Amino acid sequence: MSIYELFHYSLFLGLFVAFTYNKKQPPVFGAALAFWCILLSFLGLSFRHIPNNLSNYNVLTANAPFFYQISGTWSNHEGSISLWCRILSFYGFLLCYRGRPQSHNVSKRGGHRETLFYSFVSNFVKNPILSLPRYEQKSRAAPQLYTPFVLRTFVDSELRSRRNRTFDGPALFYVYAPLYPERKMSFAPLGARLPVVRGEGKRMSLLLHLARDDKERASSIDEQRIDGALGIALFFSPFLSASSDPFVRNFFVRTEPLAESNPVPQDPISAIHPPCIYAGDVASAMGFGLCRSKMMNGIVALHSPPMRKDAAEKNGTLFRSAGCVGSRITSELFTLKFKHVGEKCYPALLLRSNRSPLMLLRRRFFALSSLWTGALVDTGREQAKRVVRNGKKDTTTSPLCWTAGANTVVSDQDQEPIRIWILTCRWFLNVGILLGSWWAHHELGRGGWWFRDPVENASFMPRVLATARIHSVILPLLHSWTSFLNIVTLPCCVSGTSSIRSGLLAPVHSFATDDTRGIFLWRFFLLMTGISMILFSQMKQQASVRRTYKKEMVMARSTLVHLRHSARAQPRPVMLWKN
């Protein structure tokens, strides 16, 4: 077995690793192994071009300079696809290296809010599956129930130091449905034990999946990102091995070259131009994979069955929730009990005795206005509020509400890798198109005609889409446009490649006219576009359904703000009305 056959077998080894890398621990190991295998195969192909090994099918000339012998590796269809796979494996290695488990984009403070969010969902479907820790008192006081969100947000530092102290009244809060005032509903509090309904097995399993630990959930998201980005390699590696094998040998022995070297493409700019275009196109594949995994994660994690419209109509209620700050658990179901109040009473807002109704209205208006301006939406940032204590200014950081939106599990830091790959794509495409235009101007002498060449048009369309993606990723309100443009850019690159390599378009310097290869690329283009559009349409449909809960979200967020201030001041509960 010659050394060239070893290089050929390393290509299949890289293909095998590309199929099984997800089972490696950590994932960066599998991505690195696939990258080195494909790099070894590409170097073996280059070693066939440099010594003018005429036994290779793609080596036609023997008198080209050394620099153009190297560039001859990607000057044919098989070599260009091999370079495409090598760049793709390198980008995948960078993505796995940046997405290691210790650098997850799930913030700690977001995890606490997610716990409260899942508790909200569990109360909404009357299946409280979250078993929160009980902080038993060492004294004779009754046991109390806390959530991590309450411990960090609702309860002040001074109040947390003496959390074993009971309140005069309960801090349990209910949000009743004004659409169905005739229905009386009772809900279990956070952590209460209720029998599990067998008919809701799927719903329970999904919520259990959502209520996992932060590290486990972050690891799952990380695997989805890597799987979405490197899944493109599962197509190009078989395509390279099956229909575009660069290591095909001649059936006869050649001692003389079949053709003389063409002096026209022998230009340094022409040799650098194709790798830049390939690097830009493959960078769009990384953005495509990240957005695809983000859409799939958003459909699973954010649009669960309890959040659907039919579930809301079935239960006939808005978001019903309970936030326990320090109430007693008297039975399996919570009942509101107020001191010096009759037995029959309706739940009401906790009102501070030292606060006027005007102050409450101002606070409620602030909550509503902040919601429309985006201040209440959790984007991983917290608003600093100036607090004057004992005559000194103290800057404390306090979130205004819990997350209930498009990024419950993944914070806005997830946009950073997408932004990096968009900039990488646009930069390489700019350099490649600029070099190609310069070479055409001083070599062909046709100037602007170069941009009417189908090959350059195929690379110019992703560049325009990359410019649009930069503008959409900068604005935080255009997440759907960012996802849509990312899933459109890669099919645009694949469609241009398939049109040129199938012979549908005949450019000046085309080197591939095989119809079977073009049909293979077209099938991949249709499959990828169809799956992406289905995912995007489902995401938009679920987002449109979620807009119907805007009023309910306003109520829940504003009441949480009020509950936080009430918990800090240890209010004396006052009923607004009673029977």
Curated annotation (Swiss-Prot):
UniProt keyword annotation of Mitochondrion present: yes
Localization of this protein: Mitochondrion
Gene Ontology cellular-component terms listed: membrane; mitochondrion
InterPro entries the record matches: Cyt_c_assembly, Cyt_c_biogenesis, Cyt_c_biogenesis_plant
Main location: mitochondrion
Record key words, sorted: Cytochrome c-type biogenesis, Mitochondrion
A Pfam family hit: Cytochrom_C_asm
An individual GO BP term: cytochrome complex assembly
GO MF annotations, alphabetized: heme binding; heme transmembrane transporter activity
UniProt record similarity statement: Belongs to the CcmF/CycK/Ccl1/NrfE/CcsA family.
Protein name: Probable cytochrome c biosynthesis protein
Source organism (scientific name): Daucus carota
